[in-house]
Amino acid sequence: FGVEIAHKDYQEFFIEGNQRYTSTNYQIEGDWSGAAPMLVAGAVAGEVTVENMSRLSLQADTAIIKALINAGAEVESTDTSVTVRRRKLKAFEFDATHCPDLFPALASLAANCEGTSIIYGTERLLHKESNRAATLAEEYAKAGIEIDIDEPNVMRIRGGKIHGCTIDSHGDHRIAMSMAIAALTADAPIVIKGAECVAKSYPSFFDDLEQLLVK
């Protein structure tokens, strides 16, 4: 856009005021943190394709692809889309230190895996919309899934049968989306209190789930 930016080792940035902007064509990338729950839906419940997603993106949350592959899901990508297909899922290890917004989606993935998955980086979750590590453990327990956060900076999720229940989103959009994806394979409906909080980052989340014929 014609604006000059100075920096110190890309840690500090300095932008002089009163610069003149110039028009240009710019393509805005899809949001990988928003796409993550839908990609997990494909891994646990059927085939899902998300458009306008580039594997060459610099967004840290592209790491969801690595987690899906490690768990055994089939992943196919093009220059503009990612498709995930359900396969038999196995426990996985993953370091989410640099992509903490993936924790809720990873929880719904791990809940559907055979064995105990280990995810590192829980210290990054203390000051999110809720204390996400504690909230995930509390709400998934209601669905019969054990999440152990006793070890510093580590979350262990024992996959198993997901039961219908009523959960509280705690006003956290990613918790609501995580439990909605978990509900896809539950043995009875999961009721999510405060589900409207998804509007913070993904207002059409439930509409998009309905397009996948989810009820």
Feature annotation, model-predicted:
Residues F1-K215:
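Short, structured segments at the rim of ligand-binding sites
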